[in-house]
Amino acid sequence: MEKIRFLECLSKQYPTIDSAATEIINLQSILNLPKGTEHFLSDIHGEYKAFAHVLRNGSGAVMKKIDDVFGDTLFEDQKEDLASLIYYPSEKLQYVKNQGRADSSWYRTTLYRLVSVCQIVSSKYTRSKVRKAMPENFRYVIEELITEKKEVLNKKAYYDEIINTIIEIGCADEFIVEMSNLIQRLVIDHLHIIGDIYDRGYGSHFVMDSLMNYHSLDIQWGNHDVLWMGAFAGQHACIANIVRTSLLYDNLSVLENGYGISMMPLVLFAMETYADDPCAQFTIRSRHGSEMNTQTVLAMKMHKAITIIQFKLEGQLIAKHPEYNMDNRRLLDKIDADKGTVTIDGKEYPMLDRYFPTIDFNNPYELTSEEQSVIAKLCNSFVNCSKLKSHINLLLQKGSLYKVCNNNLLFHGCIPMNEDGSFRNINLFGEDLCGKELYDELERWARKAFFSVNEEEKRVGRDILWFLWNGADSPLYGRDKMTTFERYFIADESTHKEIKDVYYRLFNDEEVVDKIFKMFGIKGDNAHIINGHVPIHHTEGESPVKCNGKVIIIDGGFSQPYHKVTGIAGYTLIYNSYGLMLTAHEPFKSVDYTIRSGRDMQTNQVATEVSQKRILVGDTDNGKKIRENIKDLKDLIKAYRNGTLRQNQKN
């Protein structure tokens, strides 16, 4: 009966045998097309300019297509010139005009070259899919130019006439821009962001803006992303963490200019409370140098003020949730105010800062009324920010803690493990959970923070978002503790150490990795774990490819401060119909440099995994869905033919 009801619904879309049969033929043809190109990025950390460029060049995929089309028929500088036009069409056009090169001959040559590139990048898709990607204003013209027309005898004259008309009527600039954007879109079929869009970079909000308009993507949440999700949900400790790190990295512009969140409540409080305090331990890590000025002095006071608020809020939260197993992060009550020391793990350390006017050491985690007012006002700004709302909605709609896609397991951090290679049981919700079950339950509660109608469930969900940010058992964080307190207040650097989860030592063990695959229902020789979070030390010879190619770590350091540590500016992964290509990127110089020189950011192919045969749509997850659709349509035709359902022929 259920099957009949389903077929009745399907019959509204395909009311006749002919319409169902036509769709089966269309779907069957799609199965035999080459699979679309998947693009994997991780740990963007707000570095918008580098991120935007990698999106535009498809991690070298655009240049690869130009090479495929033109081979040795163009010089390298000509190919680079064409590539930079495709990446930045409006800016490159203006540059060419300023040079006096934009005559009809240049336009004609450029348009032909763009058409040639567009023909090859569109060849792996159905006409319908390409048509939908085309700009509406030039859809017909582009389709004419990139489609083979066997009925046209003098093809050169036919295409010449179209190109000449585009130039003569003054539409060449707009056409070049639209063609370039179409090429960018068709080069990458689907984008995977494996966590940490947010962090210290100056452009997290711009990254989110660009993802809002991206044609096809999924996101695996990183610990920095869930921190922002928690802040929007109204979790006070998450808000304090974001404000603190924004001050630490001289990055208030994202909050104030990007999201319109006013820091004035914190400014007034810090100026009054820490007026005579130099706040020397709360320096600002600016990219523009460490010059001490009035603005920096104020930022340091704000930095200390919000840090103390954060430690109080986190202490309250940890006490409320003993199941988080984070009591070693409650350190305010371990301070001996008279001696100016703090005791951690039984050892006493001198404090680098001893001035705490807002801490009552008889009740150290209680906020003063002024601190309560500051965090309440900040919270009001976060939860009522419409732009942040749209960005967090995107994270909720397109995001998850993990994803299985085309035999690849994608997650940001780790699978919590024991020393013996078994999955670590974690009890957060009254039962022991590990591996996939832990991920699934954590995601359910994270979503409850936004969608539950039960206020207690929403509160628990909000708190789980904070736990995911820095919890010792958080699969997103993957370290035994976050030593924020120690880094501010203790000189002994041995206390700053954060021990990585055992997973990061065991992901070279094939038996362990195969066990992870089995838990997530992944089979076959071409299975991979793809994750980020832990920067790969490229210059020290560390490889991002682990476990004989089964594990690929693609955090190579998009974030500028990590460039010295990793030696590069990030890894990106391409998975096309020929296999996997892992690329290491040199730091992105600037848009202006790319336009003027034509030179792209330097990329080095680190590893490849070539498929024994070309991978078709039929070999992918989408292919499985298409086969299911074909089966349903065949059942519908059968129901029409045996009289179970009646065709709805239109007169």
Where are these regions (language model features)?
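Feature recognizes metal-dependent phosphohydrolase scaffolds
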Residues: 1-651
